[in-house]
């Protein structure tokens, strides 16, 4: 089958040359679970040079906002980007995740219909019926995978979700673990777990 040209590639593919150049030219300490130092993340977002490679700016705005965002993520805390529609919140979220983890695909899109299952875990019901609760039947959400791997997950439009879903997310992030009673186990968050959420004002 013929491979079709995609409309939009993820940031880590689109800017792979720049990301590789920054990693190759790295001179500063890289935090656990990160692909590059906070200083290199800032260079990737705001522009500069890495060796002979020109790093294009991804965000044209207040440098301090990006510095605070990177500092927050260094402490394994979650980050909420709030602003008017069209002010590059999702764009910044994707590029921060691409620079820090090299994978911006762990995304939950918030809507009025988003359920707790979409932030915790759900089940493959065919497998669940066939063999009962099992690891094979467990369907891991992007946030669950981020907890397992100690990575960053992204939650777009969190303010569109019902309050009970937001409460469940806050509980999950404060406890840093997900209980799976059907399997009689818990999934604890690996070091470096963070969540970047966006919300419109």
What name fits each language-model region?
Residues 2-201:
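AAA+ P-loop NTPase catalytic core and its hallmark functional loops
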């Amino acid at each position: 089958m013929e491979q079709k040209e995609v409309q939009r590639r993820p940031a880590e593919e689109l800017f792979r040359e720049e990301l590789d150049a920054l990693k190759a030219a790295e001179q500063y300490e890289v935090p656990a679970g990160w692909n590059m130092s906070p200083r290199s993340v800032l260079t990737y977002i705001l522009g500069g040079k890495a060796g002979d490679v020109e790093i294009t700016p991804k965000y044209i705005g207040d440098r301090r906002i990006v510095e605070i965002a990177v500092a927050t993520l260094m402490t394994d805390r979650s980050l909420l980007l709030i602003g008017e529609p069209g002010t590059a919140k999702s764009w910044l979220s994707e590029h921060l995740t691409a620079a820090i983890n090299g994978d911006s695909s762990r995304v939950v899109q918030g809507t009025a219909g988003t359920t707790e299952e979409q932030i915790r875990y759900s089940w493959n019901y065919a497998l669940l019926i066939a063999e009962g609760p099992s690891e094979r039947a467990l369907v891991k959400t992007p946030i669950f995978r981020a907890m397992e791997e100690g990575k960053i997950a992204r939650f777009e439009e969190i303010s569109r979700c019902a309050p009970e879903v937001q409460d469940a997310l806050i509980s999950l992030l404060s406890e840093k673990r997900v209980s799976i009673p059907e399997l009689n186990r818990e999934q604890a968050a690996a070091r470096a777990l963070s969540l970047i959420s966006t919300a419109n004002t």
